[in-house]
Amino acid sequence: FFTQGYAAAQDRLFQFEIWRRQATGTVAEILGARELKRDIGTRLFKYRGDLDRELNHYHPEGKAIIEAYVSGVNAYIKSVVNTPEKLPLPFKILGIEPQPWTAEVVISRHQGLLGNIGQELEIGRAVALIGPEKVKDLLWLHPQEPALDLDPKIDQQLLFEDLLAPYFAFRKGVQFEPRDLQPEYRTAEAISLLNQFNELSKDSLAIGSNNWVVAGSN
């Protein structure tokens, strides 16, 4: 697992750094105030339970496995920081360096499959307005009989505020702007090269994770 972490970081170091910042709520450190809402949302959804218990939930030796993986990631990061010429170009363009990972980054939920959260809130608002029984009739949830009663501890008025703004802020993809680049990478020549790359990558089949081309003779 150490080797897996090392190899993954070697192949995807910049992606790993952006993920780490998304997971730790530190994107604004490199992209400024426009990312504050994202970082606030990230920290709001941060896991605050028993970390050891969470790590071992995935596997009896989950803590050891994840810590070994993180150690591998960090070993490669250290080798890059100590050898500046190995630093991938995107870091140089932004004027940043990769930072160490922790186990918390590995189990972060910033890419969770939570697509029904909006529907859950809409149902909660409907229950607050007309009650659970009428909502069941309107939504036709048969043959099941879900319990739609709201927890009495919930302030129902708060359901009608923009509760999901922090969630959507931390879930959105990271977008870079010209002002984020170091001055030497904002020249006309650099922009021309970037535009050429964008033209090449317009084809949806031009890129892909782990794509391989094998000769027919094989």
Located regions from the model:
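Substrate-recognition/specificity elements adjacent to catalytic centers across diverse enzyme folds
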Residues: 1-218
